[in-house]
A protein has these predicted regions:
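Thiamine diphosphate
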Residues: 9-21
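An anion/pyrophosphate-binding glycine-rich loop and adjacent beta-alpha core
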Residues: 19-21, 27-113
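Glycine-rich beta-alpha-beta "Rossmann" dinucleotide-binding loop(s) and their flanking helix/strand
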Residues: 1-10
């Protein structure tokens, strides 16, 4: 429920079919309230921007330009905080050194294109 209105960025085939099959076969269900959210998606791309951008010194701000949470809590926890912001939007703010670190990641390079 915390991420009910989050942008989905998983595989399009992930529709919960395995859960339905398991239930139909009488499998026990547990921990279905768990999730892995991500607080950094490249705008217009749906590509997760890996969290080292933040753990190495970047921060996130809302549309008003204000930092709204402690990003050190983790990217799943931060995803919930982003959803609490106007328009469910946050901007990652970082410097050239963080940019250089992130260039090693293919997803980051794709998001730049």
């Amino acid at each position: 429920p915390e991420l009910e209105h989050a942008t989905f960025h998983g595989h399009p085939g992930n529709k919960g079919d395995a859960i339905a099959w398991g239930r139909a076969l009488g499998a026990a269900m547990a921990d279905l309230g768990a999730y892995q959210g991500h607080a950094g998606l490249a705008a217009g791309h749906g590509i997760p921007i890996l969290w080292p951008l933040i753990t190495e010194g970047g921060v996130q701000v809302n549309r008003a330009g204000r930092r709204f949470a402690n990003e050190a809590a983790g990217y799943s926890e931060q995803a919930v905080e982003v959803l609490r912001q106007d328009g469910h939007v946050a901007w990652s703010i970082f410097d050239e050194a963080r940019h250089a670190i992130m260039l090693q990641f293919e997803d980051y390079r794709q998001a730049l294109s």
